[in-house]
Amino acid sequence: MKRITILGSSGSIGKQTLNIISKMKENVCIEGLAVGSNIKILKSQIKKFKPASVSVNSPAEAQNLKKWCISNNIKTDVYKGNTGLEKLTTMPKTDMILAAIIGAVGLKSIIAAIKAKKDIAIANKEAIVMAGSYIMKLAAENGVSVLPVDSEHSAIFQCCTDEKKSQIKRIILTASGGPFYKYDKDFSKITVEQALDHPTWKMGRKITVDSATLMNKGLEAIEASVLFGVSIDKVEIIIHPQSVVHSMVEYVDGSVIAQLSNPDMKLPIQYALTYPERLPSNIKPLNLIEINKLEFYNPDFNKFPCLSLAYYAAQKGYTVPAVMNAANEMAVASFLNKEIKFTDIAKIVGRTIKTHKISKSTSLDTFIEADYWARHYAEKLINEI
């Protein structure tokens, strides 16, 4: 029986993970759950999964939740804030942490989990982009496995588990293209509602906007470089609208290994939870005759400048990816609040990167300071628009 703690259980990945676990009760159980402020969802999860501990952001909400647990005769410990997250990640009985808190805020809890020698199922690509070299070094020192949850990185992982990284010629990262890869109108007129209308995946608001700008694919390119120990120039992005080929790995002998399935996040989530085993699932079987065709296109870096910014940040390295990620988080939040235009996202990220003075220190504090600086600088740019 594998005991799992989910950080971000009220989000899209968290809820899908719980749905999977509810059908795998003989193999996996829930030890802990953490949410930001969605107490209503957390209460329903507590009733169903009976975790030993939970954590919420607000001290007041934590106190109210404690009272609710007592009144309902529920024996679940309730914690709060960053301290609560750290308690959840270090619980002795937990075997694996599923890190699904979006953005850089999830970084410290991942670090705490690794130091407590907990395996990590990583759904927080921003943490890897921000401080990936630090995370992977720490994981190696503590004998911790970092298992990807993103469909693309799960695919890469499945394509190269038994191969030496030195034999990889390139990683081919597929992208659906989002809602705008064929869009030929004025990008500055794109609305929030249009950006949130993804043709393939149902995801959270922030990642859906990132998919629309293709920044999500840029972040994933950096994540692939870090997770699989290859230089960014060996990571190639191609547009694949059907989202059936989730990624490919080409080796030095010319062989290309791909992972295919119908687009369903439950598959990579389940694989991360059960690795190295594979268990039956209710994923719709792949029927290539029914699909009929698989299309592939080169991405347009001019049309989607966030892709160029991501590759630039990866090539510069050090603190630049952290700065890019933080500026993007700020810009996307402002776009979702209808404060800036769709095209302003890339402009804000680009100006923040170009103003940043690179630090070559690899300490965790350096990455956190770069993130802090970038958020404040991006906010300044947003206020000037």
Curated annotation (Swiss-Prot):
Its biological purpose: Catalyzes the NADPH-dependent rearrangement and reduction of 1-deoxy-D-xylulose-5-phosphate (DXP) to 2-C-methyl-D-erythritol 4-phosphate (MEP).
Identification of the protein by name: 1-deoxy-D-xylulose 5-phosphate reductoisomerase
Annotated binding of 1-deoxy-D-xylulose 5-phosphate, by residue: K125, S151, E152, S176, H198, S211, N216, K217, E220
Catalytic reaction annotation: 2-C-methyl-D-erythritol 4-phosphate + NADP(+) = 1-deoxy-D-xylulose 5-phosphate + NADPH + H(+)
Pathway: Isoprenoid biosynthesis; isopentenyl diphosphate biosynthesis via DXP pathway; isopentenyl diphosphate from 1-deoxy-D-xylulose 5-phosphate: step 1/6
Binding site for Mn(2+): D150, E152, E220
UniProt: NADPH binding residues: S10, G11, S12, I13, G36, N38, N124, E126, G204
Family annotation (SUPFAM superfamilies): 1-deoxy-D-xylulose-5-phosphate reductoisomerase, C-terminal domain (SSF69055), Glyceraldehyde-3-phosphate dehydrogenase-like, C-terminal domain (SSF55347), NAD(P)-binding Rossmann-fold domains (SSF51735)
Coiled coil: none
HAMAP family according to UniProt: DXP_reductoisom
Known cofactor(s): Mg(2+); Mn(2+)
Record organism: Endomicrobium trichonymphae
Record EC number: 1.1.1.267
Xref: PANTHER family: 1-DEOXY-D-XYLULOSE 5-PHOSPHATE REDUCTOISOMERASE, 1-DEOXY-D-XYLULOSE 5-PHOSPHATE REDUCTOISOMERASE, CHLOROPLASTIC
NCBIfam families per UniProt: Dxr, PRK12464.1
GO MF assignments: 1-deoxy-D-xylulose-5-phosphate reductoisomerase activity; manganese ion binding; NADPH binding
Family membership noted in the UniProt record: Belongs to the DXR family.
